[in-house]
Structures are given as C-alpha cells and as structure tokens.
C-alpha cells in the first residue's frame, strides 16, 4: 500500500537528486550557482571532490527539494563512478557550444550513464555558453537538437552568465521527474524519493554532516 509523502520538517514533499555531467570547463558549476543562488562568477577555483547545492521549488502544489550535485573537477580524471550516480533521478548533460570536443564527448558521458545510473533516470541535453558571439560558436543549435532527438531527450541552450534558460532547464527536468513519480506504483518508493516520517531523523543527521561542504 502506498504511503503518502510527509513533509520532513514541514518544508518539502519530495527530494529529487539531480546531477550535472559533462567535460571540465563547460560551465556546470556556473549553471549550478546561477540556479541555486542566482549569482554568476568567472573566477572559480576547481576543487577535487563532489559538491551540491539545494533549492526548493513548487510544482503542482507540491514542494520539491532539488539536491543538485556537481562533480567539482572529478570529470578531469574520469573518476565518476556508480557512487556518484546512486539515487539520481535526473541528469543534465552539459557541453560548451564553443567547444566541439565537449559536444562530441556527450556520447561518452551517455555511455557512462548507461553503465552506472538507473535505467529510468531522466536526462536532458544542455548547450551552455549560448551568450557567446556567433563567430565563436562551434556547435550549431540544430546539431545539439539532432543529438537530443537521437537520444529521445529534451534540449536547451543556456547561458549562466545572462541567465538564459537556466530556470527553464532545471524546472523542465524536475517536472518530468515528478510526473514520472506520480505514474509509478509503490515499487518506486524504496528509491528514497518520497520522504516519510521515519526518514526525518536521518535527514536531519545527514544535513548536519553536509553542512561542512563548501562550494567553489
């Protein structure tokens, strides 16, 4: 029998883990910071590890807590493994529209996802740095759309600098995940998406431990 979600600490109904995947330098951290804090900086100091930000949004009358994870430099060493993908409900595959190699590597990231992520994870393709001058563009919009169509996923071009489509891309994948959750039966519940009263104490403990994480 399905258990109705209970708000942990009365501040959200669902917890959704999202991942940002892509080559180093495509702007994943900038997208994360723009969406979570509505700020932008070009002076990031890359750290080695995994970091995340949280933002709570409302969809269809439900408060959705988005936990968005950034690789924080690990992608340079190809060390992203199953542990990073565990529990992920959505993945944003990001490339730089001025860097064709980052676009070509999307196929490799897709293979990585197929190896480590759950079969039903939602995916979305993101062409970042769309604010750059057209003379610097290496990947036409049509080419990005064609790749997304090939994989059967949505496609957005974004700019963390100008805030172009940043809100739209995160809200789009969150909405798709929520819709999928409402269509699933009780078999989906062990994945830890619905927050029950029993989870509240554990969530509080985890939050305390996560407080030491810093964002760069």
Swiss-Prot record:
<dbReference type="GO" id="GO:0015031">
    <property type="term" value="P:protein transport"/>
</dbReference>
<keyword id="KW-0813">Transport</keyword>
<comment type="subunit">
    <text>Interacts with PI5K2.</text>
</comment>
<keyword id="KW-0342">GTP-binding</keyword>
<keyword id="KW-0653">Protein transport</keyword>
<comment type="similarity">
    <text>Belongs to the small GTPase superfamily. Rab family.</text>
</comment>
<dbReference type="InterPro" id="IPR027417">
    <property type="entry name" value="P-loop_NTPase"/>
</dbReference>
<dbReference type="GO" id="GO:0005886">
    <property type="term" value="C:plasma membrane"/>
</dbReference>
<feature type="binding site">
    <location>
        <begin position="128"/>
        <end position="131"/>
    </location>
    <ligand>
        <name>GTP</name>
    </ligand>
</feature>
<comment type="function">
    <text>Involved in membrane trafficking from the Golgi to the plasma membrane.</text>
</comment>
<keyword id="KW-0472">Membrane</keyword>
<feature type="lipid moiety-binding region" description="S-geranylgeranyl cysteine">
    <location>
        <position position="212"/>
    </location>
</feature>
<keyword id="KW-0449">Lipoprotein</keyword>
<feature type="lipid moiety-binding region" description="S-geranylgeranyl cysteine">
    <location>
        <position position="213"/>
    </location>
</feature>
<keyword id="KW-0333">Golgi apparatus</keyword>
<feature type="binding site">
    <location>
        <begin position="70"/>
        <end position="74"/>
    </location>
    <ligand>
        <name>GTP</name>
    </ligand>
</feature>
<dbReference type="InterPro" id="IPR005225">
    <property type="entry name" value="Small_GTP-bd"/>
</dbReference>
<feature type="binding site">
    <location>
        <begin position="159"/>
        <end position="160"/>
    </location>
    <ligand>
        <name>GTP</name>
    </ligand>
</feature>
<dbReference type="Pfam" id="PF00071">
    <property type="entry name" value="Ras"/>
</dbReference>
<dbReference type="GO" id="GO:0003924">
    <property type="term" value="F:GTPase activity"/>
</dbReference>
<keyword id="KW-0547">Nucleotide-binding</keyword>
<feature type="binding site">
    <location>
        <begin position="22"/>
        <end position="29"/>
    </location>
    <ligand>
        <name>GTP</name>
    </ligand>
</feature>
<feature type="region of interest" description="Disordered">
    <location>
        <begin position="196"/>
        <end position="216"/>
    </location>
</feature>
<dbReference type="GO" id="GO:0005525">
    <property type="term" value="F:GTP binding"/>
</dbReference>
<dbReference type="InterPro" id="IPR001806">
    <property type="entry name" value="Small_GTPase"/>
</dbReference>
<protein>
    <recommendedName>
        <fullName>Ras-related protein RABE1d</fullName>
    </recommendedName>
</protein>
<dbReference type="GO" id="GO:0000139">
    <property type="term" value="C:Golgi membrane"/>
</dbReference>
<keyword id="KW-0636">Prenylation</keyword>
<dbReference type="InterPro" id="IPR050305">
    <property type="entry name" value="Small_GTPase_Rab"/>
</dbReference>
<feature type="compositionally biased region" description="Low complexity">
    <location>
        <begin position="200"/>
        <end position="216"/>
    </location>
</feature>
<keyword id="KW-1003">Cell membrane</keyword>
<feature type="short sequence motif" description="Effector region">
    <location>
        <begin position="44"/>
        <end position="52"/>
    </location>
</feature>
């Amino acid at each position: 029998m399905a258990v109705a979600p209970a708000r942990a600490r009365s501040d959200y109904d669902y917890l959704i883990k999202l991942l940002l995947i892509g080559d180093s330098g495509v702007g994943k951290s900038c997208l994360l910071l723009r969406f979570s804090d509505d700020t932008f900086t070009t002076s990031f100091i890359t750290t080695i590890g995994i970091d995340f930000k949280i933002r709570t949004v409302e969809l269809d009358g439900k408060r959705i807590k988005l936990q968005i994870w950034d690789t924080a430099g690990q992608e340079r060493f190809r060390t992203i493994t199953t542990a990073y993908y565990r529990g992920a409900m959505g993945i944003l595959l990001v490339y730089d529209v001025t860097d064709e190699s980052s676009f070509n590597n999307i196929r490799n990231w897709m293979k990585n996802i197929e190896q480590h992520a759950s079969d039903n994870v939602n995916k979305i393709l993101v062409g970042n740095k769309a604010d750059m001058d057209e003379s610097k563009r290496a990947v036409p919009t049509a080419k990005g759309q064609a790749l997304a169509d090939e994989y059967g996923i949505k496609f957005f071009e974004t700019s963390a600098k100008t805030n172009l489509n940043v809100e739209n891309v995160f809200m789009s994948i969150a909405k798709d995940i929520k819709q999928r959750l409402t269509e699933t039966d009780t078999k989906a519940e062990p994945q830890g998406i619905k927050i029950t009263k029993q989870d509240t104490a554990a969530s509080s403990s985890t939050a305390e431990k996560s407080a030491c994480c810093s964002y760069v």
